[in-house]
């Protein structure tokens, strides 16, 4: 305005959303057969607009001038059926079927429009076997599809992802311990993964990566050592790989081969040790370890997010004041007890100069030792 082409300004983006939904189901449960039939219908209508709320050189423009005014609408209709058959007191099987129909209608900044329709068929089937009162085993297969989001379309031309998930597990429940062990293999086609970059409003950018997989073993449990001590560990070992990662690099399309999927550490460990001082006082110690991970699917060294180990110490005290408070609780938590300096997240970006690709990273440092004090009152 008034000949001004460049100005410092502050902009603010808004969403004005309406969501409507309905669902129905029919349940049949008799003898050894249980059947559930149902469906849902959801409609989302969103207005997306941005305003200029301050400008150094405003010219003739008004405050809260809308520099874009778009919409984003999504309709979804799905039908599902859940069938379970109990063969005997030790074995039962289930089959779940779902059909999702999705319609996107949206306008993006720059005048680009989305007019997409998807029809996904998602089956799941499995077996449960109860060996005895303490041990149970299961196996399942599921196929799932996921459509891109509006943000994905704003940052590229994505495809929906497809997943085939295989799981095998063991559940144990005894007097002194409760634990679950789960093996999984997740085979993806066109998985939408984080690239490490952010768009101009801070959303993480995702992109399809062709063929990829996530495979691993998960363990979580509770161990009752005695009347005072309880240990609650959980651990995941995994391998998360892009089979052939292709991207533009140094002016041409490069195949980086098999790489780790971004933000997917191979080892995650957590543990809680609880000690009951008495019937009113609980002392606990939390430990969390996250292994090394990459913030870029290229796995270049500059995108490494280092592993970290952090510990917390807490105390819960239950009390009552007759006539005032019942079953109230005082909570004290010391986060990052050992004052560890670490980063739990960050980002990675690329830029090209004369057909040469350069990269950089940024990190989010976490708080050093800090304290929380809380009171819960029940009247």
Residues of each region from the PLM?
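Membrane-embedded beta-barrel scaffold of Gram-negative outer-membrane proteins
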Residues: 130, 136-140, 160-246
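Short loop/turn motifs that connect adjacent beta-strands in outer-membrane beta-barrel proteins
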Residues: 27-34, 90, 134, 176, ...
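Face-selective signature of the C-terminal outer-membrane beta-barrel domain
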Residues: 1-109, 130, 177-183, 232
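C-terminal beta-signal and adjacent terminal beta-strands/loops
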Residues: 231, 239, 289-294, 318-379
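Transmembrane beta-strands of outer-membrane beta-barrel pores
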Residues: 30, 41-47, 97-105, 141-147, ...
């Amino acid at each position: 305005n008034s000949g001004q082409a460049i100005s410092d300004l502050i902009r603010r983006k808004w969403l004005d959303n309406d969501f409507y939904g309905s669902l129905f189901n029919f349940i049949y449960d008799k003898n050894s057969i249980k059947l559930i039939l149902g469906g849902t219908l959801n409609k989302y209508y969103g207005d997306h607009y941005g305003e200029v709320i301050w400008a150094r050189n405003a010219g003739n423009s008004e405050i809260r001038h809308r520099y874009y005014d778009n919409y984003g609408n999504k309709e979804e209709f799905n039908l599902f059926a859940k069938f379970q058959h109990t063969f005997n007191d030790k074995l039962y099987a289930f089959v779940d079927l779902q059909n999702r129909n999705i319609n996107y209608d949206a306008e993006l900044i720059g005048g680009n429009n989305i007019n997409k329709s998807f029809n996904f068929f998602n089956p799941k089937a499995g077996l449960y076997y109860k060996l005895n009162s303490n041990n149970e085993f299961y196996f399942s297969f599921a196929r799932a599809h996921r459509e891109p989001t509006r943000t994905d379309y704003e940052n590229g031309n994505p495809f929906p992802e497809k997943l085939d998930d295989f799981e095998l597990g063991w559940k144990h429940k005894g007097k002194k311990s409760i634990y679950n062990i789960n093996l999984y293999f997740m085979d993806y086609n066109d998985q939408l993964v984080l690239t490490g970059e952010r768009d101009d409003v801070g959303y993480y950018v995702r992109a399809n990566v062709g063929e990829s997989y996530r495979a691993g073993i998960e363990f979580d449990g509770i161990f009752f050592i005695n009347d005072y001590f309880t240990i609650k560990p959980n651990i995941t070992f995994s391998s998360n790989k892009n089979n052939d990662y292709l991207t533009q690099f140094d002016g041409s399309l490069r195949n980086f081969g098999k790489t780790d999927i971004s933000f997917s550490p191979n080892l995650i460990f957590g543990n809680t040790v609880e000690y009951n001082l008495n019937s009113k006082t609980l002392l606990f110690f939390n430990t969390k370890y996250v292994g090394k991970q990459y913030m870029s699917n290229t796995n270049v060294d500059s995108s490494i997010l280092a592993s970290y180990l952090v510990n917390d110490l807490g105390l819960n005290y239950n009390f009552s004041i007759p006539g005032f408070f019942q079953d109230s609780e005082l909570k004290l938590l010391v986060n990052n007890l050992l004052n560890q300096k670490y980063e739990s997240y960050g980002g990675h970006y690329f830029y090209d100069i004369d057909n040469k690709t350069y990269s950089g990273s940024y990190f989010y440092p976490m708080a050093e030792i800090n304290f929380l004090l809380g009171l819960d009152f029940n009247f």
